[in-house]
């Protein structure tokens, strides 16, 4: 039992250190970055549902699940985070504080649009308040 607790503590320590490193790398884990990661996960999951359940994916030839399309989606999500990381480093180099926020807002809007598109492919009506919120975010991103 003591070995289990030691291993558990070791794993938690390693995970905490990795989390702290990633947070530091991204200039802190703020609400915007948290929102982006959540939206990325929702978009990926709803994309899987559109392909796997509804067979309406535009990412595959037959509209169904395809491992290559899923892998491309994961690669794009990783590249999005790399671009955010580039924005953070540019902020540090230039001594500004708005580049990361502008980039994150742009990607949040992109993910939100994709989530809404996935919902539409599932046959769900999209409330106007969601459409208006996306428009507001898009305008904020354009201003920055």
Model-identified regions with their sequence ranges:
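Helix-coil boundary and interhelical linker segments in multi-pass alpha-helical membrane proteins
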Residues: 22-33, 90-99
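Canonical alpha-helical transmembrane segment with a positive-inside/aromatic-interface signature
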Residues: 112-144
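Loop-to-helix transition at the N-terminal end of transmembrane alpha-helices
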Residues: 30-45
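Hydrophobic alpha-helical transmembrane segments and immediately flanking/interface helices
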Residues: 93-121
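Juxtamembrane helix-capping/reentrant segments at transmembrane boundaries
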Residues: 57-80
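Alpha-helical phosphate/pyrophosphate-handling elements in metalloenzyme active cores
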Residues: 8-28
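Hydrophobic alpha-helical transmembrane segments of multi-pass integral membrane proteins
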Residues: 13-19, 37, 75-89, 103-111
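Membrane-water interface of transmembrane alpha-helices
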Residues: 42-57
């Amino acid at each position: 039992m003591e070995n289990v607790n030691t291993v558990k503590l070791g794993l938690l320590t390693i995970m905490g250190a990795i989390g702290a490193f990633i947070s530091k790398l991204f200039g802190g884990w703020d609400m915007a970055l948290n929102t982006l990661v959540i939206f990325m996960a929702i978009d990926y999951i709803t994309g899987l549902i559109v392909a796997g359940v509804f067979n309406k994916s535009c990412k595959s030839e037959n509209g169904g699940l395809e491992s290559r399309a899923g892998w491309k989606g994961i690669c794009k999500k990783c590249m999005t985070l790399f671009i955010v990381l580039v924005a953070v480093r540019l902020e540090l180099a230039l001594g500004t504080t708005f580049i990361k926020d502008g980039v994150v807002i742009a990607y949040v809007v992109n993910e939100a649009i994709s989530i809404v598109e996935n919902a539409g492919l599932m046959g769900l009506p999209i409330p106007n308040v969601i459409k208006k919120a996306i428009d507001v975010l898009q305008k904020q991103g354009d201003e920055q």
